[in-house]
Amino acid sequence: MKITLHQANQGDCLLLTARDGTTLLVDGGMKGSYRKHVARSIGTMARTGTQIDLVCVSHIDRDHINGILQLMDDLAAWRVFDYQRGSGNTIFPCPKGIRPPAVRAIWHNAFKDQVAEESGGRPSDSGGSRRG
């Protein structure tokens, strides 16, 4: 397994690549560090046709989630661009951000699940861990 630690200022951002090529992006750091460091690195994945199999958000603190939110914004902007160009709109502007790779799935540590676990309450229906 290959582990790539991205500069994320106060937060975290790791890219895990398994031997079989499966990729997992854990957190995204701050928005600025995502744009400056992470987007460039994962942009090479898009150029080679490699996708991110799973994006994992450990929790919703801004130093972990803001980079992922920027990734989602970039993905949406490029999808709109591709649609417009594919529909013959040749004057539609190219997005400013680096094209990110496709993302197959997203997982997040939901607040509802955390509260249920910490309070000893019933686990949520959203797939959180369950106590026996």
Language-model features: locations:
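Low-complexity, flexible helical/coil segments
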Residues: 39-42, 60-64, 89-94
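Metallo-beta-lactamase
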Residues: 52-63, 86
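Flexible, acidic/histidine-containing loops and adjacent segments that form or flank the divalent-metal
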Residues: 1, 66, 70-132
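Conserved beta-strand hairpin/beta-sheet module of binuclear metal-dependent hydrolase folds
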Residues: 1-54
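Active-site environment of divalent metal-dependent phosphoester hydrolases
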Residues: 10-12, 31-33, 60-66, 112-116
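Extended aliphatic helical segments
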Residues: 26, 38, 55-57, 80, ...
